[in-house]
Amino acid sequence: MLPRYDLPNAAPPPLREVQLLLNSEDLENEIDWLPDWLAERGLARAERRARALRAALRALVRANNGTPLDDEAVATVNAAARRVSIQVDASGAVRVATDGDALDQVVAIALGAMLDGSWGRLKACRHCRWTFYDRSPNRSGTWCSMQLCGNRKKTRAYRKRRSAAR
């Protein structure tokens, strides 16, 4: 069963669909929901492609935290982007579109977010590596959730200070 997003770190639609793919694996607890994600979208046979795309998009998200981009991730996303088109709608707005499957839709959403600037708000938690949407005004968020990883970090710091004072 896929994790759901009712937490404050959930990206707004449609970027939430990208976040769902990226978080289809819990790296900290070694749980992989990718087969469920694919089955829900009728793509059970696209697992290899999905794993490559998920890894590449994660690398792009880590770049939002300051990690250098790797060439393989860029090449994977660029290859997937060939199934996506840039269009101008009747109002003159530019949008990214595809008639492809759910993975192509994820690529279109990600590229659209890069164009509109919202991509920079998707980040990887420095503790658990979960992808979260940074809602802080200055885009300085570092944890997936203050209740989870933020609390863990602060508790460790408190214990360290306390043991040093003894």
Enumerate the predicted regions with their spans.
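BZIP DNA-binding basic region
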Residues: 105-106, 112-159, 163-166
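Short helix-coil boundary/hinge micro-motifs
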Residues: 1-133
